[in-house]
Amino acid sequence: MGRVFKKKGGAKREAEEEKQEELVMRKKLRKEEEPEPVEDVEEDEDVSDEDDEDIDDEEEDEDEQNIMDFDFEAYPPSEDDRDGIVNMLTQTFLRTDIDLKAMSEGIIAKAPHGVVLTQAYDDEETEEDYMAYGLCTTVPLNDNKDDAPKFIKDLFTYVLNRAKKGAPTEIYKKIEEIQVSGDGKSALFVNERLLNFPTIVVPQIFGSIREDLSGFETKYKTIIYIQKLRIVETDGSEAKVGASSNGSSGVAGKKKGKMGKAEKKRAAAAALANAEIEFDNPEDRVLFEIKEGKEIHFDYPVHMDVEPGSKFHSTEKDGKKWNPFRRLVIMDDKRFDAFLKKGSDGIII
């Protein structure tokens, strides 16, 4: 079985000696191989039943032969992980003015809180062999309002600009309230993994974060979480939205006048609410199925921030075009804890 270790302190190389609790997982990746050349068999050549059975057995076992096991380690962020953490943060914050290096240093400073997921290594491998496969932690947003780090100010500028363009007024005002509160009871939840990384790691990682938070002296009351998702592009959606928001009666040529900003936002939100959605992190869907606590959110497009050809740009699947979006969620502590608990209990995805 592959293993995930949660190290509570010290260097990564000392995990075994520290005898910390083990978090158990298994990751299986399929390795595609070039097909073996098939020899032509003459039509008059006899092939025994036993030979046929051997061939069938080989085909049935092909998948097992191509399965590779990888061990992963999960441990608190350290200086060695700075570049990997930046890469993880870049998945959410595309082409922003946020100082992600400074944010990564802030995350490292909060260790042992948080989890960085990387492939296990042996003694012959070097630090250069490392890359981060996942990151899960919380970043306090307002525990030092009068002298907040620049990356925190940049973060609020970013989310406020996005909210101003596409969010209801209540969400914009809520973000402003969080920014000025200065009580240290609000945080950003970071939950990043490489695209299509197995969700089998979720229970162990969420359980670790939930355990960490239970020991915090100051409890978070409000959490901001920026999710990655894709939304199907619907032909003629703009026309439908315009007609619906204008209360069209179907009378040709009748004009209702220009839509105001608030109407446009409501119309856009209604269109997105009815569209097909896929979350990059499948567990994120559970957040909106939970009944405990409260949450508000809005979606905003990011395809203009992604290089064409990137795996994070628009994709085609089953004849549909899926455009990249971000969903900014603001939730209370009850919803957040229920989300972590659901994940740590082993949600079915």
Swiss-Prot record:
Biased composition (Basic and acidic residues): 11-33
Region (Disordered): 1-65
Basic residues compositional bias, start-end: 1-10
GO cellular component terms attached to this protein's record: nucleus
Compositional bias of kind Acidic residues: 34-65
Protein family according to the UniProt entry: Belongs to the BCP1 family.
Protein name: Protein BCCIP homolog
Lineage: Eukaryota, Metazoa, Ecdysozoa, Nematoda, Chromadorea
